[in-house]
């Protein structure tokens, strides 16, 4: 799949769901994986010619596992001239040592998002973009149907009033197989 087609799919999702408004400050939630880096790269390209002006940032939550190193993410952000924020936490200690929750992934995700949303508020950033792709939406809907008996997937846009942040998912039309193309054709 060509990069132009993928950028077109991202732009289409943004327009279909009014994900970007004039003057938005948008942070891409970056894990260091291909999906989030591809989204950051695509948003940087779109930022140059999109008709609505917006500021772009990248944010990572370091949950505190030993050996985690986000130097590569920081360098990538520098190379495309996107301000980068790393939120350092002790979430791993809380989840795995202090709490020993039976569902550590769920608790970790909640704490990680909470830490990022808090920092976004401090920085005056009003939106966070996650790199959930088309396959993620389909898998989530099917798992919800199988395990919960209901058909549910992530909403494309979600306002979180307690955090004052809007979550957007611009890659919702991009198939998994096309994600790497955004990085490797640049």
Tell where the protein language model's regions lie, with residue ranges.
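Conserved small/polar residues in nucleotide/adenosyl-binding loops
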Residues: 184-185
């Amino acid at each position: 799949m060509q990069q132009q087609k993928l950028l077109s799919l991202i732009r289409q999702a943004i327009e279909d769901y009014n994900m970007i408004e004039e003057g938005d400050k948008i942070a891409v939630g970056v894990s260091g994986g291909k999906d989030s880096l591809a989204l950051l790269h695509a948003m940087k390209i779109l930022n140059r010619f999109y008709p609505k002006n917006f500021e772009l940032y990248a944010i990572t939550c370091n949950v505190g596992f030993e050996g985690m190193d986000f130097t590569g993410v920081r360098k990538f952000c520098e190379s495309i001239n996107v301000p980068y924020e790393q939120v350092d936490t002790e979430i791993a200690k809380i989840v795995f040592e202090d709490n020993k929750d039976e569902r550590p992934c769920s608790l970790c995700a909640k704490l990680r998002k909470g830490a990022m949303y808090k920092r976004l508020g401090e920085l005056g950033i009003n939106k966070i973009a996650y790199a959930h792709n088309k396959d993620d939406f389909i898998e989530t809907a099917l798992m919800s149907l199988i395990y919960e008996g209901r058909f549910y997937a992530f909403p494309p846009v979600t306002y979180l009033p307690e955090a004052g942040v809007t979550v957007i998912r611009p890659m919702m039309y991009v198939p998994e197989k096309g994600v790497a193309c955004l990085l490797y054709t640049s």
